[in-house]
Amino acid sequence: MNGSVFQKDNKFYLKVKGSGEFEMGLVSEGYRKLSTLIYLILSGSLNKNAILFWDEPETNMNPKLISHVTDALIKLSQMGVQVFISTHSYFVQQSFNLFAEYQNKGKNKLDIQFMSLYKDIENGKLKCEKSKDLSEISHNAIMEEFDAIYDKEQELIE
């Protein structure tokens, strides 16, 4: 993000290089979310040993900004912030999966866990499945729907 966040007269603003200052209520949801992260970091609220819970960070966000959010969350984790997110987004899930599989190496390797909550068909109980490897999660509604739409597309083009 090519800007900075500041507070003036009890209001938050985003200052964008070459574009001016914008009251936070007037910027897009994606920039507002990124700005909030920046402000929490600069104010010291998100530091080593802090915990961040974020439900569906992709909600109301331009898909082009999702990688910036996932990159920021990974950097926060590398700084020592424990990050928990929930998502229904293929893009968010795959961004973390690609990082975990191909980039999460070395002495600062993060302990990334993928989890899926689902209802057991046999007894109706809520269950949790977790793994360090996303491909080992068998109850993955995101991938199930991705596969279903892919199969539908294949049927339509044949």
Task: Tell me the role of every PLM-derived stretch.
Residues 1-13, 24:
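ABC-family P-loop ATPase nucleotide-binding domains
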Residues 16-157:
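Switch/communication elements of ASCE P-loop NTPase nucleotide-binding domains
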